[in-house]
């Protein structure tokens, strides 16, 4: 939960303290027949306006606002999120879709159809990125998607106190550990991306509690989100690799 500067309790219909929460849904999507729709529907994120009793802390829901995701191509599978030091909701798109299989994968085809009414319209390179939601004082939210933080299985990004450095796990088997260093504080739209190289220093086969390793960082490149988004709009999988 968070407070937002400029939030007016009377205008919001709140009698106590106005507080807000950004909520997202991962495993709670079913169709009318009760069938699991995981990954087959675009993921929503909503802003809750809550009325907090200043004496007891009790919360009451006043408003539910669905954030418009049309300008960020909808959201793929959202997972763990964090609150940025500057008060925004840092979400995730995990299990980035395989671009080579996008036209045959039933899950991605269903996602595309439910998003665009067209099984072939969704671009797999638009997903697997880091969405950020700015919560407004009137209880609404605005979405942007950062394409320059790596196309990985994002989950639970953590921004360091310098408000420029972010550590990111890759929630996937044999995934990596990534670091992003932004050009400016409170702004993830441009910066340098790194991946961790972990070197074991303790004996092979030893107890996990006795393990020791060193970490160095390999520079992957510098980019703005706009530059990577432009590439995502143009490239196809065979531009970078062949699969036999």
Question: Where do the language-model regions lie?
Answer:
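Conserved small-residue
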Residues: 1-244
């Amino acid at each position: 939960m968070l407070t937002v500067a400029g939030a007016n309790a009377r205008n919001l219909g709140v009698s106590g303290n106005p507080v807000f929460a950004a909520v997202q849904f991962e495993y709670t999507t079913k169709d009318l027949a009760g069938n699991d729709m995981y990954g087959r529907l675009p993921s929503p994120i909503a802003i809750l306006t809550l009325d907090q009793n200043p004496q007891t802390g009790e919360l009451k829901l006043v408003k539910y606002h669905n954030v418009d995701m049309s300008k960020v191509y909808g959201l793929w599978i959202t997972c763990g999120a964090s609150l940025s030091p500057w008060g925004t909701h840092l979400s995730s798109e995990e299990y980035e879709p395989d671009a080579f299989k996008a036209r045959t994968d039933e899950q991605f085809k269903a996602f595309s159809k439910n998003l665009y009414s067209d099984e072939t319209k969704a671009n797999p390179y638009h997903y697997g990125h880091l969405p950020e939601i700015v919560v407004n004082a009137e209880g609404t939210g605005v979405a942007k998607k950062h394409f320059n933080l790596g196309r990985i299985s994002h989950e639970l990004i953590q921004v360091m106190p310098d408000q420029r450095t972010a550590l990111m796990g890759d929630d996937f088997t044999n995934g990596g550990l990534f670091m992003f260093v932004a050009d400016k504080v409170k702004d993830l739209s441009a910066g340098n991306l790194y991946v961790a190289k972990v070197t074991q220093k303790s004996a092979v086969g030893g107890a996990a509690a006795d393990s020791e390793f060193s970490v160095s960082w390999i520079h992957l490149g510098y980019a703005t989100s706009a530059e990577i988004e432009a590439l995502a709009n143009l490239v196809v999988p065979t531009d970078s690799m062949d699969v036999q």
